[in-house]
Curated annotation (Swiss-Prot):
GO terms for molecular function: hydroxyproline O-arabinosyltransferase activity. This is Hydroxyproline O-arabinosyltransferase 2. It is a single-pass type II membrane protein. Glycosyltransferase involved in the O-arabinosylation of several proteins including extensins and small signaling peptides. Catalyzes the transfer of the initial L-arabinose to the hydroxyl group of Hyp residues. Contributes redundantly with HPAT1 and HPAT3 to arabinosylation of EXT3. InterPro entries: HPAT-like, HPAT/SRGT1-like. Ubiquitous. Disruption phenotype: No visible phenotype. Short-root-hair phenotype. Hpat1 hpat2 double mutants have longer hypocotyls, are early flowering and show early senescence in leaves associated with a decrease in chlorophyll content. Hpat1 hpat2 hpat3 triple mutants fail to produce detectable levels of Hyp-arabinosides, have low fertility and shorter pollen tubes.
Length: 358
């Protein structure tokens, strides 16, 4: 049987039990937060660190709190700065239900953006647990944030650093129904045999699993507090199951959230206009968010160059070690409006963010 067969699942269960025990400890001992600036250590708390979350003074049941998980890498940092710039631009505009904002930093230590962006510092998973798949830290970071931070709003928008808000976002959720973007590559029916390991038949038809990830999603705070620890444990279990890990690859954590939402009976209103992903989506007119996950490569006549390095290009992966320069060259005539808007909005943000290239 070997080490894997004899000891693998006991070790996994021990780790999951440790995380659940820690989560339950946090729930039972939820201390009030001191009113300090985001990221400041409490002088009287010894080894404990508490963080405040800035929220607006107005309070309505329809406000949502925007939460963005991130690391302290240069790659993540510049995207967070652009994202936060556009959040601030639209937060108080007519039609907005946008409340407070938190960057959930799961690197385990404060970084250079603590005074620029409201930030909660979360502990990462123990070394080696993520197996190089860093987004496994996301659900564990949400568990910590939901239980340690004081969040005034009744709803949460889970977003990502590479999201640009293009207009005020209303609360798209309705009652107990969350609101989410449907991803074409999340296919529960296709992978039913794999998903049944985590969503048994007694939980209902596989169609109860929505074709979503955890972002963008607007969900009630109370529902997310129930979903998050399940999302954490399902993510770990999926990553440690070779068949599931191979089937889902880099979208594994997205499937884990979709399963966890279904396990807790939280259905989602699917909004295809919630977000667009250039260059494949060509217009921004109806959308709320640009997700620049794909590279944009075009020739100088405006024709897309699929699978090739473009004569003109924008790809966030080109800026892993340093932020993009100010005043990026705009795309040539004929390139989709969504790509032009993306680059224009990045240029506006970088022109107005102090000390950008530092």
């Amino acid at each position: 049987m070997g080490f894997r067969g004899k000891y693998f699942f006991p070790i996994l269960m021990t780790l999951s039990l440790f995380l659940i025990i820690r989560y339950n400890y946090i729930v039972s001992d939820d201390p009030p937060l001191r009113q300090e600036l985001p990221g400041r250590r409490s002088a009287s708390s010894g080894d404990d660190i508490t963080y405040t979350v800035k929220t607006p003074s107005k309070k309505t049941k329809r406000l949502f709190h925007t939460a963005v998980t991130a690391t302290d890498s240069v790659y993540s940092t510049w995207q967070c700065r652009v994202m936060y710039y556009w959040y601030n631009r639209f937060r108080d505009e007519p039609g907005s239900d946008m409340g407070g904002y938190t960057r959930i930093l799961h690197s385990g230590r404060p970084d250079g953006l603590m005074d620029e962006i409201p930030t909660f510092v979360a502990d990462p998973l123990p070394s080696g647990v993520d197996k190089g798949y860093v987004v496994l830290n996301r659900p564990w970071a949400f568990v910590q944030w939901l239980q340690q931070a004081h969040i005034e709003e009744d709803y949460i928008l889970m977003a990502e650093p590479d999201h640009i808000i293009v207009k005020p976002i209303p609360n798209l959720a309705r009652g107990n129904l969350a609101a989410a973007f449907p991803f074409f590559y999340i296919e529960p029916k296709k992978y039913e045999s794999v998903l049944r390991k985590f969503f048994p038949k007694e939980n209902g038809p596989i169609s109860r699993i929505d074709p979503i990830g955890n972002s963008p999603v607007i969900v009630t705070k109370n529902a997310l507090m129930k979903i998050a620890p399940t999302w954490m444990n399902v993510s770990l279990a999926m990553k440690n199951d070779p068949q599931t890990d191979k089937a889902f690859g880099w979208v594994l954590e997205m499937y884990a959230y979709a399963v966890s939402s279904a396990l807790h009976g939280v259905s989602n209103i699917l909004h295809k206009d919630f977000m667009i992903q250039p260059p494949w989506d060509t217009e921004t007119k109806k959308t709320f968010i640009i997700h620049y996950t794909y590279g944009c490569d075009f020739d100088m006549k405006g024709k897309m160059m699929v699978g090739k390095i473009g004569e003109w290009r924008f790809d966030k992966r080109s800026y892993g070690d340093k932020p993009p320069p100010r005043n990026l060259t705009l795309p040539p005539r004929g390139v989709p409006e969504s790509v032009v808007t993306l680059v224009t909005m990045i240029n506006e943000a970088t022109a107005n963010i102090p000390n950008w290239e530092s």
